[in-house]
Amino acid sequence: MRAEDPYRRIAAVYDRLIEPMQAEVRSVALDVVPPHPGWQVLDVGCGTGTGMARYVEAGCTVTGVDVSESMLERARARLGDRAALHLTDGDTLPFDGGRFDLVTTSMVLHEVAADARMALVAEMVRVARPDSRLLFIDFRFGSLRGWKGPMLRALSEVVERFSGHYSGYRSFKTSDGVPGVVGKAGLGIEREKIVAGGNVAIYVVAPKP
């Protein structure tokens, strides 16, 4: 039996409260890995579909997965039949291996437990084509920049403490974030783009070491 929808209460207001803080990062991500028309793109933890919409507009064939039916309902309302949506955990992706040209996940790794985090990355690697790329967007725990960095770091700490998944955030932080996770998976980071005053980074990773 699937657990209670963890985002049932926030789904209705997510795009108004949370998405504005992520919009700039999503735009930068498109510059970091420009999508090609015809690409098969998978968004793991697709939420309300705002990230997928950008790839649809670029002419990609887009698939999204999420653990929240409430969030997927919002994604369906936004995208209709322009994206294939699946209710599933990231550590059990229902796709054949080597299918996708780009596999992306945004602000997901810090929310899950360490074992689920590694399983999710392994599944992303499995479903990616050998010549594809993995794109990770998540918190960064290095030095901060300007006034925005410290402000967002403090805000993030408060939000995560009351979000219901602080243990995941804490273990993600002590594991050195995305660099630690992909390093443990035997992968290497090809490019890091620091955004949000150093509080978030976009990482490009090859699916094969």
What are these regions (language model features)?
Residues 185-187, 191-209:
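Core SAM-dependent methyltransferase catalytic element
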Residues 118-130:
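A short glycine-rich, Lys/Arg-flanked "PGG" loop and its adjoining helix->strand segment in the class I
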Residues 104:
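A conserved beta-strand element that flanks and buttresses the S-adenosyl-L-methionine
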Residues 137-185, 191-193:
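C-terminal alpha-helical "lid/dimerization" subdomain adjacent to the S-adenosyl-L-methionine
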